[in-house]
């Protein structure tokens, strides 16, 4: 499992579960549109949950956009 942040330009940043969402958001200096957790098992993947440190959750289209960016 990884954590992720989506910024206002719909760019995704995946990072270790050991790092807090708020720390990554502060280092990016970007407006956070969504944040949550990413899990992949073969072809199946899921973006879900909510960042407690940002009080921002996943959006329904996050997984679609993450898959598109990873395929590019």
What are these regions (language model features)?
Residues 1-72:
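Intrinsic low-complexity, intrinsically disordered or marginally ordered coil/linker segments
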């Amino acid at each position: 499992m990884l954590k992720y942040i989506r910024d206002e330009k719909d760019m995704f940043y995946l990072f270790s579960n050991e790092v807090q969402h708020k720390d990554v958001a502060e280092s990016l200096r970007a407006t956070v549109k969504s944040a949550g957790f990413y899990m992949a098992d073969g072809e199946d993947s899921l973006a879900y949950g909510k960042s407690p440190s940002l009080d921002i959750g996943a959006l329904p289209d996050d997984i679609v956009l993450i898959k598109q960016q990873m395929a590019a």
